[in-house]
UniProtKB/Swiss-Prot annotation:
Substrate binds at R18, W19, H33, D69, D77, L78, P79, T80, D137. Catalyzes the strictly specific dephosphorylation of 2'-deoxyribonucleoside 5'-monophosphates. This is 5'-deoxynucleotidase YfbR. The record marks R18 as: Appears to be important in orienting the phosphate for catalysis. GO terms for cellular component: cytoplasm. The lineage of its organism: Bacteria, Pseudomonadati, Pseudomonadota, Gammaproteobacteria, Enterobacterales. A divalent metal cation binds at H33, H68, D69, D137. It comes from Shigella dysenteriae serotype 1 (strain Sd197). The gene is yfbR. It holds the Pfam family YfbR-like. Its cofactor is a divalent metal cation.
Length: 199
């Protein structure tokens, strides 16, 4: 059998730090970000289905979110101000991402490629799937800002404001529910979130 470097590459996502131009109280890597996005995207899909009459595959949404930044193992995490400096740079970066996604897909053994390709290639996502993953991605970046600000790091003030605008642009009923039910706890200490359910 031919060896594949696919998972060896994905394992290196933990070596790529997010927010590279910002001073962080706690550094966040792409691997842990992807897990959080998967959990939040799954929740958004479940909320959409249970509360607002949606009919999306929540487990697939979680998988798409797990792999949504996989190409960054080849491209790195380009800072947002650079990535979106102008439309030409944004367009070129999208083309680079597409090449990186295809390179990852090509690493997967041929007999498994049809399973992994639709998870890695964002062009295979439906509009609804893409929307839920993007909502979760923005929500997790917003939560990171809240955590940094709570730790006294004002470096994230402008990022929080920018992300509030992004969340407003991507607003949905399931996001409103998540913001109302789950986000307030991110402003609390461990003691405060633990007092109702001590071990």
């Amino acid at each position: 059998m031919k060896q594949s470097h696919f998972f060896a590459h994905l394992s290196r996502l933990k070596l790529i730090n997010r927010w590279p131009l910002m001073r962080n109280v706690r550094t966040e890597n792409v691997s842990e970000h992807s897990l959080q996005v998967a959990m939040v995207a799954h929740a958004l899909a479940a909320i959409k289905n249970r509360k607002f009459g949606g009919n999306v595959n929540a487990e697939r949404i979680a998988l798409l979110a797990m792999y949504h930044d996989a190409s960054e193992v080849l491209t790195g995490d380009l800072p947002t101000p650079v990535k979106y400096f102008n439309s030409q740079i944004a367009q070129e970066y999208k083309a680079i991402e597409k090449i990186a996604q295809q390179k990852l897909v090509d690493m997967v053994p041929e007999e498994l490629r049809d399973i992994f390709a639709p998870l890695i290639d964002e062009h295979a996502y439906s509009d609804e799937e893409k929307s839920l993953v993007k909502q979760a991605d923005a929500l997790c970046a917003y939560l990171k800002c809240l955590e940094e600000l709570a730790a006294g790091n004002n470096e994230f003030l402008l990022a929080k404001t920018r992300l509030e605008a992004t969340l407003a642009a991507r607003r949905s009923q399931e996001m409103d529910y998540f913001m109302e039910v789950f986000v307030p706890s991110f402003h609390l200490s461990l003691d405060e979130i633990s007092q109702d359910s001590p071990l």
